[in-house]
């Protein structure tokens, strides 16, 4: 899909992404985080992600992150992008700061699917 094209850059990246996606399948269908952590993650998305993707997530330095723009994106791939960044782009990895469940919560949030 078009939204995922930057992921294909860099040798060895697609196989690693596929392996990590398989590992994410073991996590719940809806990422579970505490209400307090969910509030912290929402703040992180609006402040940190918004600094590149626009405060309304409609795009800026980074691509738009609205539910409409991510309609074709699957949550596992989005979570991997959050965790590992996009090599060769300004998108940094957040794995040192977030768990896989938190990255899935962010993916659900961006797609408008959080409980």
Predicted segments with their positions:
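Sec-dependent signal peptide recognition
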Residues: 15-22
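Sequence/structural segment immediately N-terminal to covalent heme-attachment motifs in c-type
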Residues: 33-58, 77-84
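Hydrophobic h-region of N-terminal signal peptides that target proteins for export
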Residues: 23-31
């Amino acid at each position: 899909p078009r939204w995922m094209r930057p992921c294909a850059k860099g040798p060895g990246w697609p196989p690693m992404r596929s392996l990590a996606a398989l590992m994410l399948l073991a996590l719940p269908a809806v990422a579970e985080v505490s209400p307090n952590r969910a509030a912290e993650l929402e703040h992180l998305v609006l402040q940190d992600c918004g600094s590149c993707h626009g405060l309304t997530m409609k795009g800026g330095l980074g691509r738009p992150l609205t539910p409409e723009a991510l309609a074709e994106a699957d949550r596992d791939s989005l979570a991997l992008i959050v965790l590992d960044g996009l090599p060769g782009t300004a998108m940094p990895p957040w794995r040192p700061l977030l768990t896989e469940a938190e990255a899935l919560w962010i993916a659900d949030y961006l797609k408008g699917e959080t409980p």
